[in-house]
């Protein structure tokens, strides 16, 4: 027992000593990346393409590729969207950062309708629709949770257009 106490007492000072003073090295230095021009007449936030796993906004050749695995019904994802969209769009518009959103089904069928609706009009409207769904999540999420197991079964195998009609009739 005494050895455990000694080891425990020495652990903190040893850990702190291992941290050092922070003067041993310097952060790497480099020049800021030059902005990359968007295609004529557009901003990079207007350049959206479908990827294998989601949708990418911005320069597909950007030095930094930011990927979010998000769920339409996730409150944390909604908070991230509401709080970061403006700043993220600013980073994307410089051409050095791209943002890809990949759907992640945290809550199963409840996540499907929003993703399907956001894809209906093609890549150009995907991000504005996702942002709108996140911004209004608390209002529509209560309605989605009223879908019965029988209705969930009916939605199985429906395409985006059929799913949209079904949901429009429900709400």
Say what each PLM segment does:
Residues 2-111:
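Extracytoplasmic thiol/disulfide redox context detector
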Residues 25-28, 39, 44-51, 150-171:
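Long hydrophobic alpha-helices with heptad-repeat/coiled-coil character
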Residues 79-170:
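Structural alpha/beta surface segment adjacent to cysteine/selenocysteine redox centers
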């Amino acid at each position: 027992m005494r050895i455990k106490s000694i080891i425990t007492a020495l652990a903190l000072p040893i850990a702190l000593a291992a941290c050092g003073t922070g003067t041993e090295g310097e952060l790497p230095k480099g020049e800021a990346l030059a902005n990359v021009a968007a295609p004529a007449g557009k901003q990079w936030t207007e350049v959206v393409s479908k990827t294998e796993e989601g949708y990418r906004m911005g320069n597909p050749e950007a030095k930094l590729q930011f990927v979010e695995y998000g769920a339409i019904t996730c409150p944390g994802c909604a908070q991230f969207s509401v709080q970061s969209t403006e700043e993220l769009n600013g980073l994307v518009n410089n051409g050095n950062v791209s943002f890809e959103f990949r759907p992640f089904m945290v809550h199963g069928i409840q996540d499907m309708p929003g993703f399907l609706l956001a894809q209906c009009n093609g890549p150009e409207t995907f991000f504005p629709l996702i942002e709108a769904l996140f911004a209004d999540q608390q209002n529509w999420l209560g309605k989605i949770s009223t879908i019965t197991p029988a209705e969930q079964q009916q939605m199985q195998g429906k395409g985006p257009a059929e799913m949209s009609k079904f949901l429009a009739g429900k709400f």
